[in-house]
Amino acid sequence: MGCIKSKENKSPAIKYRPENTPEPVSTSVSHYGAEPTTVSPCPSSSAKGTAVNFSSLSMTPFGGSSGVTPFGGASSSFSVVPSSYPAGLTGGVTIFVALYDYEARTTEDLSFKKGERFQIINNTEGDWWEARSIATGKNGYIPSNYVAPADSIQAEEWYFGKMGRKDAERLLLNPGNQRGIFLVRESETTKGAYSLSIRDWDEIRGDNVKHYKIRKLDNGGYYITTRAQFDTLQKLVKHYTEHADGLCHKLTTVCPTVKPQTQGLAKDAWEIPRESLRLEVKLGQGCFGEVWMGTWNGTTKVAIKTLKPGTMMPEAFLQEAQIMKKLRHDKLVPLYAVVSEEPIYIVTEFMSKGSLLDFLKEGDGKYLKLPQLVDMAAQIADGMAYIERMNYIHRDLRAANILVGENLVCKIADFGLARLIEDNEYTARQGAKFPIKWTAPEAALYGRFTIKSDVWSFGILQTELVTKGRVPYPGMVNREVLEQVERGYRMPCPQGCPESLHELMNLCWKKDPDERPTFEYIQSFLEDYFTATEPQYQPGENL
């Protein structure tokens, strides 16, 4: 179809840090090549980074690679996720403290430094609050997920809020972190309790993470073991920084944090003027448009997807985008803003390592071992489990539509738009631009897209991971794939793939959609793949 793909070099840029807030970041649509500067070796890989082979990339609509990838997704219903501190719910607290530095993006924003204190004037907007800096006396808007009530547990550097066990392990096990590094988070299993997660080391397991449940007393105190009780969490943490006292290791330093993404670019920056965007480096080109690295308002680095006129109706796109921006999860790429008149522009978070497919084939991903690959699959399942809970549908789940950031963080992109495409070679479902090899048979043949057809696609995506980006059904053309799958053919276990993972793939490929597992089950299976026989929480010595 004359679709071409170009890709630039890449380098580290935006890092991930889960927020201190009830629900993580926003949602989106986007895939593209990596940042055009230097190649940075993947810390988790066993070999050094390599140069990108730009000549071996194939066609995609928006610069992923391998085959055609439009964008993907459709919606039915959804639930609105509350922001960090929903309007009117600051509990009477008016003094908040900054958790991170922030550089103003507009004339209405306030720049501030970590530790700066604010009086909150108006928090009815949810994501962006009007505040007055106590230090400077200036008024302006601040991102609500960058602040916490002064002198609260949320303002403590070691408190990471609502974070799962697996995400805690990912952060603590990042390269460069030492034994004893720690964080405190909400308990996943016990309401009102907390968990202390510590990086440890032993001869059998090497680097690992231990989790200790912090329980709450009826009188408001806290303890890990009843023989050592504390009035506050702060006192508990201080005690264990001075003595291991039964833990695997005394607490040394707080786990490093990275600024979270703001919810949107700025207050009221949703439908933005085209002139506010500067397209700087073209990252990819495909059948339906281009992807650029650029800058918004001269201040903020973003990814910009430009759609060819006629790809979809602007009114339908804007309606779908309104739904997509309300979906927020730290494994979904946040949708920042749109230019809603043709040519449509879609503005999203920039992810430094580009698409998962390119990362596996041409980047540091080709050196990854099974534990890292399974963890990436678990992250994707985490994001899809959220989409499942929100009664949303992706429609085009594949490695080319997953973006990779620093430290192997994966985020789902390009959902919510596939059903809006008006190209005949795509809407025919068996046309040249339709991703047959990733699509469940009931969706390809009859247009029955559901979360269960997404589960089928996830099974195909798993083969992309373990084969480092190999095209599914090697040696077979689209029509042959459709015929053979209908007759019961399923891909054999890829070389080097454990049979237990192949069994999960086959569950995803059940002919009856109702027999396929939920993403909640898949996430749990993958997160516990290497640790299923270990206790979730450590009792500690003499505890």
Curated annotation (Swiss-Prot):
Effect of Y426F: About 50% loss of CSK-mediated inhibition
Keywords, sorted A to Z: ATP-binding, Cell junction, Cell membrane, Cytoplasm, Cytoskeleton, Kinase, Lipoprotein, Membrane, Myristate, Nucleotide-binding, Palmitate, Phosphoprotein, Proto-oncogene, SH2 domain, SH3 domain, Transferase, Tyrosine-protein kinase
Compositional bias per record (Basic and acidic residues), positions renumbered to this chain: 1-20
Binding site for ATP: L283, G284, Q285, G286, C287, F288, G289, E290, V291, K305
GO BP terms: cell differentiation; cell surface receptor protein tyrosine kinase signaling pathway; cellular response to platelet-derived growth factor stimulus; cellular response to retinoic acid; cellular response to transforming growth factor beta stimulus; ephrin receptor signaling pathway; Fc-gamma receptor signaling pathway involved in phagocytosis; leukocyte migration
EC category: transferase
Residues annotated as catalytic: D396
Residues carrying Phosphotyrosine: Y32, Y336, Y345, Y426, Y446, Y537
Family named by the database record: Belongs to the protein kinase superfamily. Tyr protein kinase family. SRC subfamily.
Stated name of the protein: Tyrosine-protein kinase Yes
Organism the protein comes from: Homo sapiens
Gene name in the database record: YES1
